[in-house]
Amino acid sequence: MRYMLMMHAPRGNGDWAVMNWKPEELKAHIEFMTTFNKALKASGQLVGAEGLAMPSDARIVRATSGAAPAVTDGPYPEAKEFLAGYWIVDVGSPEEAYEIAGRASAAPGPGGTPLNMPIEVRQVMSGPPPVD
């Protein structure tokens, strides 16, 4: 079963609180994520993973009745959290996906304290939902 694990990060001053961390704190966080991803890859569980650009670089695109789509800034600046990155994992049970998400959530933050970031876990559909 494939699951998408979506890491939600808190906003800080500006886009992302991590931008206010000390260099050694940011380095420890990146090293944790690198080691975490390598372990998932070595176990054969990692399908893909990516970090995402800052919310200020995001755009919302909608179809219009005209030829060109409407492109606006987004997501909303008043949001307290934003999608910072994701993993797609292939595991045998939901519990395995939850365990992986729990480890990701504990990535170190300021002072080395675990961030306890919210990680949303959703199964990737293998086909369309059943229709009665």
Please describe what each predicted stretch is.
Residues 1-132:
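Conserved, structured core segments of small domains
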